[in-house]
Amino acid sequence: LGRPAEGMEVEASGNIIKNVKSVFVPGTGGLRGIPAAAAAGMAAGDPSLDLEVLSQIGEAEQARIREYLAHTPITVKLADSPLIFDILVRAWAGEDSALVRIANYHTHIVRIEKNGAVLKDLPVQAAAEEGLTDKSVLSVRGILEFAREADLSDVEETLSRQIRFNTAIAQEGLRGDYGANIGQVLLSAYGDDVKIRAKAMAAAGSDARMNGCGLPVVIVSGSGNQGLTASLPVIEYAKELGADQDTLYRALLVSDLITIHLKAEIGRLSAYCGAVSAGCGSGAGIAYLYGKDKPEEALLKDVSHTIVNSLAVVSGMVCDGAKASCAAKIASAVD
């Protein structure tokens, strides 16, 4: 558009509306929902930062966002689309107009228009869950073999960032006042045992993320909450067991890949709570920590039983959108 929009219309698929309607928008000082997200992006976003588009917002920008939101009409509609992930934004200012459509996954811009002229037009995948990579090669046996044999130099940078970033936001969740403070409540009520710390750290990270904290998170399966749940319990158990860094990396490979393996058939957005998949993944990673020196078949049996047991208990949990209560669901999934 080239200038601030005088009005905006957002069309989104049902799962997008569900997931955004109640969650705080990072950096906005407590605003929530799709209109707030649209206003934040238009008034103060930095598109060069991709998924961290709102990461540089300060107090001055917060005031500008609130002013913009108060005086700019922003409407939200349910998209008439068969896709699970579909967002179309129209914006206008004076005689100028612009349209951008994102489909299938979070960074996939498929259409851009300016004043009716089409600047970008990509085909939309009819099967919205195809994604960028073929995950059909994944299996529990294959994941364990890879975790044991992988050259860690190929994954060390990503896993070290996962440890550093996700631990930082969990610690912030334990320090600050975010949502229902599930992580803090768990530690204060039940003590500092590793079983409590494992779920408290994951819950605290979600406390912060779901309630406006702008710290970055290394995601898994397109989800920050899943990234937190798949990693932080494993990190806590690795500390408790005195595992070295290489062992922690390999356990995180198990957790992350089991989570992705489970989510591959569920889809990026669904009515199935993704914390369940990630909690199951972290359980598999913890089982790896305890059984890493066992023979291959014995380790496979331990991890497989962990997956079956965890899914048998909590797989009925429903996703009703991202919000403060996600932290409690994460604690239940890890438990």
Give the predicted meaning of each segment.
Residues 11-19, 23-26, 100-114, 119, ...:
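A structural signal for small-residue-enriched, beta-sheet-centric alpha/beta enzyme cores
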Residues 16-24, 208-219, 259-269, 319-320:
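Glycine/charged-rich beta-loop-alpha catalytic/anionic-binding loops adjacent to active sites
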Residues 1-3, 42, 227-245, 284-293:
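Alpha-helical support elements that line or immediately flank enzyme active sites
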Residues 69-212:
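Signature of multi-pass transmembrane helix bundles
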Residues 4-16, 193-212, 244-263, 307, ...:
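Acidic-glycine-rich active-site phosphate/pyrophosphate-binding loop
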Residues 5-7, 49-54, 75-78, 153-159, ...:
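Flexible, glycine/charged-enriched surface loops at secondary-structure junctions
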Residues 1, 215-232, 273-277:
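Conserved phosphate/anionic-ligand binding catalytic regions in large, soluble enzymes, centered on
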Residues 1-80, 87, 91:
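Early transmembrane hairpin of solute transport permeases
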